[in-house]
Every structure is written in C-alpha cells, then in structure tokens.
C-alpha cells in the first residue's frame, strides 16, 4: 500500500496534470476535472503498487520460505502458485494501464 508521502505525490501529480490540461485548452480546469484526475491517478498508483508487491513476493519466495517471519506468505507457503501470482500481477498492471488511458483521455504523453 502506498505511503502517505506517495499519496501526496500522487495527488500533486494529478493536480499538475490538470494544470497541463489548462495550458493545452486555455481553460481553467473545473474542480470536478481535478478530482476525477486525482482519483484516477490514485487508483492507477494503487494498482501498480499492488503489482509491484506481487513481483517482490514472487522474486523473494524461496528466501521467504526459509524465514520464520515470512514463511506463511502465500507464494512462500505454496498457497498460491507462481502462475496464479503472475496472472494477478498482470491483471493489476492491465487495470492500471486502462485507468491511465481513461485518465489521459487517449492523449499521448
């Protein structure tokens, strides 16, 4: 889960995206537009963060299996297969990219 600092950075990024939209359209962005962009940005960051955590657990699964504190993690304990973890990670990445596509309204950045 993102830290508080990451959440602030994410919100700031969305506000900057709103400012960039203003410069392109020569219009002041509405508060609803800024809120929408912020929510999309937070959701995309949350999904990408989740995918990163799955990747980390996947890479560390053999080490985690030998450490008392981490041996009960789903991949380390075998409760989840590497194929299942990969599918879950891929779904999170795809969902995050879809959110970003909607957020950017199909524009290239």
Curated annotation (Swiss-Prot):
Pfam families: UbiA. Its EC number is 2.5.1.-. GO terms for cellular component: plasma membrane. Keywords: Membrane, Transferase, Transmembrane, Transmembrane helix. InterPro entries: Prenyltransferase (IPR039653), UbiA_prenyltransferase (IPR000537), UbiA_prenylTrfase_CS (IPR030470), UbiA_sf (IPR044878). It is an enzyme of class 2 (transferase). GO terms for biological process: terpenoid biosynthetic process. Induction: The subglutinol cluster is highly expressed when mycelia and hyphae are transferred to fresh media for a 3 hour induction period, remaining expressed under conditions of heat shock. The cluster is repressed in cultures reaching stationary phase or in early germinating cultures, as well as under conditions of UV, salt and oxidative stress. It is found in: Membrane. GO terms for molecular function: transferase activity, transferring alkyl or aryl (other than methyl) groups. Pathway: Secondary metabolite biosynthesis; terpenoid biosynthesis. The keyword Transmembrane helix applies. Its cofactor is Mg(2+). The chain crosses the membrane at residues 39-59, 84-104. Polyprenyl transferase; part of the gene cluster that mediates the biosynthesis of the immunosuppressants subglutinols, meroterpenoids consisting of an alpha-pyrone (4-hydroxy-5,6-dimethyl-2-pyrone) moiety attached to a decalin core fused to a five-membered cyclic ether carrying a prenylside chain. The first step of the pathway is the synthesis of the alpha-pyrone moiety by the polyketide synthase subA via condensation of one acetyl-CoA starter unit with 3 malonyl-CoA units and 2 methylations. Belongs to the UbiA prenyltransferase family. This is Polyprenyl transferase subC. It comes from Metarhizium robertsii (strain ARSEF 23 / ATCC MYA-3075).
């Amino acid at each position: 889960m993102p830290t508080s600092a990451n959440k602030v950075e994410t919100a700031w990024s969305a506000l900057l995206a709103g400012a960039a939209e203003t410069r392109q359209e020569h219009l002041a962005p509405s508060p609803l537009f800024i809120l929408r962009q912020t929510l999309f940005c937070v959701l995309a960051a949350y999904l990408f963060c989740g995918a990163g955590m799955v990747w980390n657990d996947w890479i560390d699964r053999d080490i985690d299996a030998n450490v008392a504190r981490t041996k009960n993690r789903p991949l380390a304990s075998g409760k989840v297969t590497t194929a299942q973890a990969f599918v879950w990670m891929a779904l999170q990445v795809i969902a995050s990219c879809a959110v970003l596509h909607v957020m950017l309204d199909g524009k290239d950045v």
